[in-house]
A protein has these predicted regions:
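N-terminal Rossmann-like FAD-binding beta1-loop-alpha1 element of flavoenzymes
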Residues: 3-32
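Conserved Rossmann-like nucleotide-cofactor binding loop
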Residues: 15, 38, 167
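Dinucleotide-binding Rossmann-like beta1-alpha1 core, especially the glycine-rich loop
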Residues: 49-90
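Short beta-strand to alpha-helix junction loop
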Residues: 58-65, 89-113, 252-259
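Conserved flavin/dinucleotide-binding core of flavoenzymes
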Residues: 225, 231-354
Length: 354
């Protein structure tokens, strides 16, 4: 009996995990490689009190059909609750969704579904090069990964599914014969980085869930998470301060403590009653490729034979705020998996005819 086609999914963010889950369910042999030590990407979570919470703010909208359908498919519909949220400067409240156990539940169930179906997820694997195999009896691609101890390993697979940043894709595919226009379009994509300070405070900063900060400030948005979902078991009130920057900005290279002091000084100016004694704990998350400022003219989904790209930076949806991108990630993952399955079926038909 012929072994199922092997697929290497590069990246264990939401896009990569959804693709891996659906491919494993369809019978493909799936291996996911992730540079970080934990899954989730921009949905990565941290323990806060007795609960998990996202290091970057996220919520669900009623219009997020693909994401809501995924939750139903995974048996998480009952965890989805809808809340009224007050937005600063808005006349009405917005109805937003959040999971009982946060989006950690979504990531955990996806990981479990992948591994239950024989999929493998490798953490601490940084892809350094992708090359074609020169041996026709071997799988089509060779993926070289650098491990945490600086050693390297080569993985073999029939198909590549890449979910990372556009520029990194160019750097790791020099050995592949890809169209010059495709490479140029990827290098033309520019990104803003993001710094997000997550604080647990004794008292709330505001009753509003979301507030945009105008002008040249160290952060551009305040999200009072617990004003929407309540204090739960976090042990206090959860506040996010989020800002986008170019990596040339001095704040990007500052230490975590320096960034905290800059952010808190501005927060205290807005509300003098806030003191550092009101802060119980805090986390700082830096995201290098957070917000693409532009995208290629064409949505290249398959730059080479057996090589697929599922990166939100390839689509106009990348311009949305990160907390709105989950639905676009799931929708694009669905389309990519459908394309892979269609191509695989076509290859099998051609093989049977020959």
């Amino acid at each position: 009996m012929q072994e199922p086609t092997s697929i290497c999914v590069i990246g264990a963010g939401l896009s990569g995990l959804v693709c891996a889950y659906k491919l494993a369910r369809a019978g493909f042999r799936v291996q996911v490689v992730e540079q970080q030590s934990t899954p989730g990407g921009m949905l990565a979570c941290s323990r806060l009190g007795s609960e998990y919470i996202e290091l970057l703010p996220h919520h669900i909208r009623k219009s997020d059909r693909s994401l809501i359908a995924l939750l139903k498919d995974l048996g998480l519909s009952e965890e989805l609750k809808w809340y009224d949220s007050l937005w600063y400067g808005k006349a009405s409240r917005k109805k937003l969704g959040y999971l009982d156990n946060g989006f950690h539940s979504l990531i955990a169930v996806l990981v479990q579904e992948i591994t239950d179906r024989g999929g493998i997820i490798q953490y601490g694997y940084t892809v350094s090069e992708i090359a074609r195999s020169e041996d026709p009896t071997r799988p089509r691609y060779r993926v070289q990964c650098v491990l945490g101890d600086s050693s390297s390993i080569i993985l073999e697979c029939d198909t590549i599914l890449y979910t990372g940043s556009c520029r990194n894709l160019v750097h790791i595919t020099h050995a592949l014969d890809m169209p010059t226009d495709f490479r140029d379009s990827l290098m033309d994509v520019t990104y803003q980085a993001n710094i997000c300070l997550l604080m647990l405070t004794k008292t709330p900063f505001t009753e509003c869930y979301s507030r945009q900060i105008p002008g040249d400030e160290p952060f551009q948005r305040i999200i009072q998470h617990t004003s929407m979902v309540g204090p739960r078991r976090y042990g206090g009130h959860v506040l996010y301060l989020s800002g986008n920057y170019l990596t040339s900005a001095p704040l990007w290279t500052a230490t975590d403590a320096e960034i905290f002091n800059v952010f808190f000084k501005r927060l205290q100016y807005m509300n003098p009653s806030m003191t550092k004694n009101t802060v119980k704990t805090w986390r700082l998350q830096r995201t290098r490729y957070a917000k693409p400022l532009n995208h290629p003219l064409d949505e290249f989904i398959q730059p080479a034979e057996g090589f697929y790209v599922c990166s939100l930076a390839m689509t106009p949806s990348s311009a949305e705020d990160s907390k709105y991108r989950m639905d676009a990630c799931v929708s694009q993952a669905n389309a990519t998996v459908a394309k892979i399955k269609e191509d695989f079926s076509r290859e099998k038909e051609l093989e049977s005819e020959s």
